[in-house]
């Protein structure tokens, strides 16, 4: 597994944002095919009657992300019955590492392996943990923190004062626009894939 350096959130570069919006306009993201840890190929953004899709960008070794595991499982449970599909997205882990992580942290959602960062590029996600809410048409409706419990690296509140992801999901499910579409996620930087020279 590649080490993932811990850094505060940095806004995605203009190039990534432009590429993400170009992909959205072309609808390319909906046909993304990725492997689950068990090897099955899935299309995490394909519309199958759900009202929204949530992508949780995670790594196995990010302390902030691991602290969020119970809340991620609660969100998955609370919104699944309301028509929301959720996936954990891992960029640099092996299938075995992801399976172990899901079990050890009792994360109750499906996972996909994304070594080429296709979903991160598509959505603009740059850190873990970061959440993205997408419409059935593949439009990013929300991207950012799960809540405001992580204030900065090394500073975490006991309880959040704003539950951003839940607010976004509630708005989407009520047919209303998301008020705060982008928030600053705090966590571990998603490093680009290593290339062989």
Outline where the language-model segments fall.
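Bacterial N-terminal signal peptides that target proteins for export
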Residues: 2-16
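Bacterial Sec-dependent signal peptides at the C-terminal "C-region" and cleavage site
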Residues: 19-31
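A short beta-strand-turn-helix
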Residues: 32-53
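Short active-site neighborhood of thiol/selenol oxidoreductases, capturing the structured segment around
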Residues: 47-66, 169
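Structural recognition of the beta-strand scaffold that forms the well-ordered cores
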Residues: 55-56, 86-90, 110-112, 143
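Short, thiol/selenol-centered motifs that function as redox-active sites or metal-ligating centers
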Residues: 59-70, 131, 188-191, 197
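Structural microenvironment flanking redox-active thiols in thiol-disulfide oxidoreductases
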Residues: 66-105, 113-122
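Thiol/selenol-based redox catalytic cores and closely related redox-interacting motifs
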Residues: 116-195
């Amino acid at each position: 597994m590649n080490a993932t350096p811990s850094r505060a959130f940095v806004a995605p570069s203009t190039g990534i944002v432009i590429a993400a919006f170009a992909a959205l306009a072309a609808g390319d993201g909906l046909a993304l095919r990725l492997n689950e840890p068990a090897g099955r190929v899935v299309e995490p953004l394909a519309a199958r009657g759900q009202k929204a899709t949530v992508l949780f960008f995670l790594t196995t070794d990010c302390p902030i992300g691991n602290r969020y595991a119970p809340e991620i499982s609660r969100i998955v449970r609370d919104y699944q019955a309301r028509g929301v599909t959720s996936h954990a997205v891992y960029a640099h882990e092996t299938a075995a590492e992801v399976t172990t992580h899901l079990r050890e942290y009792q994360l109750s959602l499906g996972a996909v392996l994304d070594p080429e960062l296709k979903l991160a590029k598509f959505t603009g996600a740059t850190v873990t943990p970061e959440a993205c809410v997408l419409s059935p048409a593949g439009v990013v409706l929300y991207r950012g923190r799960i809540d405001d419990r992580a204030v900065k690296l090394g500073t975490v509140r006991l309880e959040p004062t704003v539950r951003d992801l839940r607010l976004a999901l509630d708005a989407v499910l009520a047919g209303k626009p998301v008020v705060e579409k982008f928030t600053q996620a705090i966590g571990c930087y998603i490093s680009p894939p290593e290339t062989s020279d």
